[in-house]
């Protein structure tokens, strides 16, 4: 399908919007794994021994990890809020476009996205290439392009909230 220059510009803007959401989603998963790797206070990973005098005491280790977990959780909440705002808009699209957009945002890369679309939704690569621009145009009606999500902006909000506490 042929698109006008204005439509092409809108499609590119929506793609940028979606790429930023993808970055936020990838960072969210990294944070989730990082939080899961923090040992609980009951963990046997904590030791009372101080080998070579370089380790913190058990109490300091536990306190440090609890604070770290709390900060990571706050950052994760910011990312979740941004993604949740967007995902509610996706439900305004038809099912095919919704599946394409959601998979685009939630995949780590192109090949993973194409595989997921084919395996989970029976959407071929050629169908994706044909329908993705249409989905972007439809989605653009609902997006606030003036307030595009940004990983950097969310990180700055997080650092400001820490400073203010």
Features from the language model and the residues they span:
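Short amphipathic alpha helix immediately N-terminal
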Residues: 93-112
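Short amphipathic alpha-helical surface patches that mediate protein-protein
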Residues: 36, 105-106, 133
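N-terminal interaction/assembly modules
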Residues: 1-91, 144-165
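Short alpha-helical segments used as structural interaction elements across diverse proteins
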Residues: 25, 66, 95, 99, ...
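A short, hydrophobic secondary-structure junction motif
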Residues: 122-133, 160-165
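Helix-turn-helix DNA-binding module
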Residues: 108-127
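DNA major-groove recognition helices of helix-turn-helix
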Residues: 128-146
């Amino acid at each position: 399908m042929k698109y006008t220059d204005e439509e092409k510009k809108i499609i590119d803007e929506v793609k940028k919007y979606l790429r930023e959401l993808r970055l936020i989603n990838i960072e969210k998963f990294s944070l989730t794994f990082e939080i899961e790797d923090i040992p609980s206070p009951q963990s046997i990973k904590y030791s009372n021994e101080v080998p070579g005098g370089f380790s913190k005491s058990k109490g300091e280790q536990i306190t440090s990890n609890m604070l770290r977990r709390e900060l990571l959780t706050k950052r994760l909440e910011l990312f979740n809020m941004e993604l949740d705002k967007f995902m509610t808009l996706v439900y305004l699209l038809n099912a095919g476009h919704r599946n394409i957009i959601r998979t685009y945002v939630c995949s780590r890369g192109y090949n993973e996205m194409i595989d997921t679309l084919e395996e989970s939704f029976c959407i071929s690569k050629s169908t994706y290439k044909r329908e993705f621009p249409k989905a972007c145009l439809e989605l653009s009606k609902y997006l606030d392009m003036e307030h595009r999500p940004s990983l950097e902006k969310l990180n700055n909000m997080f650092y400001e909230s820490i400073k203010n506490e």
